[in-house]
Amino acid sequence: MNVLLGGFVIFATFVTLCNASCSFIPNERFPGDSTRECTDLKGNKHPINSKWKTDNCERCTCYKTEIICCTLIATPVGYDKKKCQRIFKKEDCKYIVVEKKNPKKTCPIDQWIL
């Protein structure tokens, strides 16, 4: 059991370091444990099969064996970087791209990454 958990932690770390759009958090279980909830990284409890949005713009789901959190943020990369700048709107979990000289005017975007 410890070997499996250790392997999973290494895998989760690898996925996170690779700038993945999702991260995996093992749900700690002990023999005889019948807990029907997950504990997130802030210590909050969530029922199995529940979903929630985090403060850092991730959508998380609690499963029996793990919590999976995936980013909700699409990052614009295909725009005129000399003429425009991207601005992150945390309240909406999204970027907007506006002209540097006239921030009221948006710029066209042709590529996004998750």
Swiss-Prot record:
What GO cellular component entries does it have? extracellular region
Q: Which Gene3D superfamilies match?
A: 2.20.25.590, Complement Module, domain 1
Give the signal peptide as a residue range, or say none if absent: 1-20
**Keyword S-adenosyl-L-methionine assigned:** no
Subcellular location field:
Secreted
Superkingdom assignment: Eukaryota
Family per record = Belongs to the beta-microseminoprotein family.
Name the keywords, alphabetized: Disulfide bond, Secreted, Signal
What the entry lists under InterPro entries is as follows: PSP94
Protein name per Swiss-Prot or TrEMBL: Beta-microseminoprotein
Relate the assembly described in the record: Homodimer; Interacts with PI16.
Q: Which cysteines are joined by disulfide bonds?
A: C22-C70, C38-C62, C57-C93, C60-C69, C84-C107
Answer whether the UniProt record assigns the keyword Transmembrane to this protein: no
